[in-house]
Amino acid sequence: MNPPILAIVMSTVISGTIMVLISSHWLTIWIGFEMNMLAIIPILMKKFNPRAMEASTKYFLTQATASMLLMLGIIINLLLTGQWTVLNMPNPVASNMMTAALAMKLGLSPFHFWVPEVTQGVPMSSGMILLTWQKIAPLSILYQIAPSMNPNLLMAMAIMSVLVGGWGGLNQTQLRKILAYSSIAHMGWMIAVTTYNPTLMLLNLTIYITMTLGTFMLFMLNSSTTTLSLSHTWNKLPLIASLILMTMLSLGGLPPLSGFIPKWMIIHELTKNDMAIMATFMAMTALLNLYFYMRLTYATALTMFPSTNIMKMKWQFESTKNTTLLPPLIMISTMLLPLTPMVLTLF
């Protein structure tokens, strides 16, 4: 894609998300979602091939259906209240419709089927945007309408998302699909705490985006797309192999890494609100995610691909890829746990 066209498309994606974030009027929020959706399609089709075209079509159809459902909920709310404001949501039918539409945009279960397929069909950089930036706008609306949402509906979607995200990733060998199922599971954790403490959902989103960005950048730096390709990493780039190991364990929520903070806080919040059984169930299902992350760390750091090369390290050219953002992302992804009290004061 030409740099000027890419700049225009990216600025439209960012503008659409910002419009959703700063608006309190349902019509401008809907327009922001549409701008974002239409501008992301060329980014998904950056490498023009049948797989990218199929993935983009699936994404467009899913998001268009979600937008239609969202507009239907907005119109029902408008007819009943006569207002366009976001915070005025007294009708449960409109609220449930909007929740379902936003769940479809986020890829929450049972509307999750498009997430692995679309992520696998697009380039790694497009998948990174899809699983990070594209989550911000729908979650910001969920944050605003949290008091008027049905907590039972949200909890059911959270349970299904955590289960699907854990089970779905167990038999995968493609890294993009693994990260897609990981995204579904993380969204489930965020939704579980939305009605009790929406601010904690923002903390979880911030840490999730940081960890996922770092992971995608490491995979792109290493040109890895499958579990098998990770086994070449230790021969070529031992430092990158160590960093992949750390970020994978952090995504799995293993202490003392940063990924443990949101899980710890969410379990504490659920227990505080007499949801101890739910907290126990979610903690147990998190082990499914941890298992496939452990598989990836084993493939990266504890295996070496058979080679006839007698040298310990393979000779290679110095990487020309830009890694400016990588060090701060890795530090935040792995070393935030001691700063938990300070982080909590920010949210």
From Swiss-Prot:
It is a multi-pass membrane protein. Pfam families: NADH_dehy_S2_C, Proton_antipo_M. The keyword rRNA-binding does not apply. Its main location: mitochondrion. GO terms for biological process: mitochondrial electron transport, NADH to ubiquinone; mitochondrial respiratory chain complex I assembly. GO terms for molecular function: NADH dehydrogenase (ubiquinone) activity. One of its GO terms (cellular component) is mitochondrial inner membrane. The keyword Electron transport applies. The chain crosses the membrane at residues 5-22, 26-45, 60-80, 150-170, 178-198, 200-220, 237-257, 274-294, 327-347. Coiled coil: none annotated. It is found in: Mitochondrion inner membrane. Keywords: Electron transport, Membrane, Mitochondrion, Mitochondrion inner membrane, NAD, Respiratory chain, Translocase, Transmembrane, Transmembrane helix, Transport, Ubiquinone. It catalyses: a ubiquinone + NADH + 5 H(+)(in) = a ubiquinol + NAD(+) + 4 H(+)(out). Its EC number is 7.1.1.2. Core subunit of respiratory chain NADH dehydrogenase (Complex I) which is composed of 45 different subunits. Interacts with TMEM242. Belongs to the complex I subunit 2 family. Core subunit of the mitochondrial membrane respiratory chain NADH dehydrogenase (Complex I) which catalyzes electron transfer from NADH through the respiratory chain, using ubiquinone as an electron acceptor. Essential for the catalytic activity and assembly of complex I. This is NADH-ubiquinone oxidoreductase chain 2. The lineage of its organism: Eukaryota, Metazoa, Chordata, Craniata, Vertebrata. The gene is MT-ND2.
